[in-house]
Amino acid sequence: MPTLIADEVSRYLESLIPARPPEVQAMEVYGREHDFPIIGPVVGHLCYQMARMIGAHRIFEMGSGFGYSTAFFARAVAENGGGVVHHVVWDDALSTQARTHLNALGLGAVVEYHVGEAIAVLQSEDGPFDLIFNDIDKHAYPASLAAIEAKLRSGGVLIVDNMLWSGRIFDTGDSSPNTAGVREMTRLLTSSPLWTTSVIPIRDGVVVAVRR
């Protein structure tokens, strides 16, 4: 994936975060070898930090992959005294793979697994949640916001990945559905009085927004 962040900066930021457990490092190797996108250790550490800062006990992930991001959230929830992280993917095999990794990390007890479309699963679950993480198909970002607003508590945190979209958001000739979805989600979150929003330029850009 092309990146807007200089390799030197990325290496420096990664050097500052704690070492990950061997199982998490193995997940990183798998992501590289299979070209499977993961949030990476720097964004993962940010997710862990945000969850710890707000004392999150109930977290909902929209688009969890094979459990890499879930590992950071689940560790935070466990250290916060317990709760649940909802892992949501569209594929049984990914759900099984995530379960294997998270059990190996000793975090399976705080994870609930769902196979289905993320917005529909969120709508079906009882809120409120302390933190929602959104990494679904980018064209669906704007459509997800109503469900997020209905399920996230006041003072809760929304984290959205890929919000710089490898620079495609700056290409005036790119009107593809995914690029348009990232642009519109950014507009919605930065213009709504319901949200206090920052775009953090690490990896592929991460939005951190607090619901008022």
Segments the model singles out, each with a brief description of its role:
Residues 1, 15-16, 35, 173-177:
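A general boundary/transition motif marking the beginning of the first structured unit of a protein
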Residues 30-34, 169-172:
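Short glycine/proline- and acidic residue-enriched helix-loop micro-motifs
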Residues 41-212:
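S-adenosylmethionine/decaboxylated-SAM
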Residues 16-19, 32-45:
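Conserved SAM-binding loop and adjacent beta-strand
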Residues 1-24:
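N-terminal auxiliary segments of SAM/dcSAM-dependent transferases
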Residues 9, 29-33, 130:
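A short, mixed-charge helix-start or loop-turn motif at secondary-structure junctions
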Residues 24-30, 165:
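Short, basic/glycine-rich phosphate-binding loops at helix/coil junctions
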